């Protein structure tokens, strides 16, 4: 860590390997539940996964110092961008995406940041793609949209950003004409609209022009079927929520933590 690296494994007697989720108000956490189940199912007895539920990112260095068995962290809202200044190294993908959701702690305490959200999105999307899914609308321009855009670039799918207000890089929702909707057969919601408990909310797109040629992907996983997906389903579209993305990004993080690099 900058301004003095932190040694996190200072005793060979400490055999437990600790991993953590960094976030705020994360008692609902998918990650902690997922890794607890993974460790139980795979009989991994020397690992634990805990929550660092913190009010500000400035608290994190002290928590790392206080947890000498800590080897890796996941990072969730609202700290994916705020954590960047604490990193000693960034992966090539993270430099491009600028939103960190995975950190590996080196043997001398250095923090290297990664983004595995794009891996989770890309690898969960590919099985559903058909040749006509060749142009995409990305709803939202926050950190999650950057990971989605990076993945679509890898897949060779051009995309158009959509935001509440028009800009040099984004259309506004008011500019989504029938022609725009029908010429973009992949629509990805990266906004929080529709997340539990506000399940009645949805992005204000003209759903009446969605057809069975469309694939609607919502990064939200709770509820399982958001209003965005339900409205697309009524029009005959294929729908996909964010649960598989979460699983795949978690497994990508696990692979990073256990790699020799």
Show which residues each predicted segment covers:
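Rossmann-like adenosine-cofactor binding region
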Residues: 169-240
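Short glycine-rich anion-binding loops that position phosphate/pyrophosphate groups of nucleotides
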Residues: 75-82, 144, 192-195, 222
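Conserved S-adenosyl-L-methionine
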Residues: 154-158, 235-238
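NAD(P)-binding Rossmann-fold cofactor-contacting core
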Residues: 155-171
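Active-site capping/gating segments
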Residues: 123-124, 238-261
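Phosphate/diphosphate ligand-binding glycine-rich loop within oxidoreductases
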Residues: 16-128
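Glycine-rich adenosine-cofactor-binding loop
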Residues: 23, 115-118, 125, 129, ...
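Short, basic, low-complexity termini and linkers enriched in Ser/Thr/Gly/Pro
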Residues: 1-15
């Amino acid at each position: 860590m900058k301004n003095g690296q932190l040694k996190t494994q200072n005793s060979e007697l400490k055999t437990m390997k600790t991993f953590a989720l960094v976030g705020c108000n994360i008692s609902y956490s998918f990650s902690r539940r997922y890794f607890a189940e993974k460790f139980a199912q795979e009989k991994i007895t020397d690992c634990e996964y805990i929550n660092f539920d913190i009010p500000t990112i400035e608290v994190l260095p002290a928590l790392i110092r206080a947890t000498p068995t800590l080897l890796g962290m996941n990072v969730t809202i609202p700290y994916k961008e705020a954590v960047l200044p604490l990193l000693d190294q960034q992966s090539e993908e993270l430099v491009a995406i600028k939103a960190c959701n995975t950190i590996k702690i080196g043997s001398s305490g250095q923090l290297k940041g990664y983004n595995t959200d794009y891996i989770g999105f890309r690898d969960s999307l590919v099985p559903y793609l058909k040749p006509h899914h060749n142009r995409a609308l990305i709803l939202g321009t926050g950190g999650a949209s950057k990971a989605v855009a990076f993945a679509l670039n890898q897949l060779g799918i051009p995309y158009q950003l959509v935001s509440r207000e028009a800009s040099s890089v984004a259309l506004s929702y008011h500019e989504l004409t029938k022609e725009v909707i029908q010429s973009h057969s992949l629509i990805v919601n990266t906004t929080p609209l529709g997340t539990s408990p506000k399940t009645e909310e949805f992005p204000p797109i003209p759903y009446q022009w969605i057809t069975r040629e469309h694939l609607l992907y919502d990064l939200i996983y709770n509820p399982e079927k958001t209003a965005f997906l339900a409205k697309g389903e009524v029009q005959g579209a294929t729908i996909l929520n964010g649960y598989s993305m979460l699983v795949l990004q978690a497994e990508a993080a696990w692979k990073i933590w256990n790699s020799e690099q």
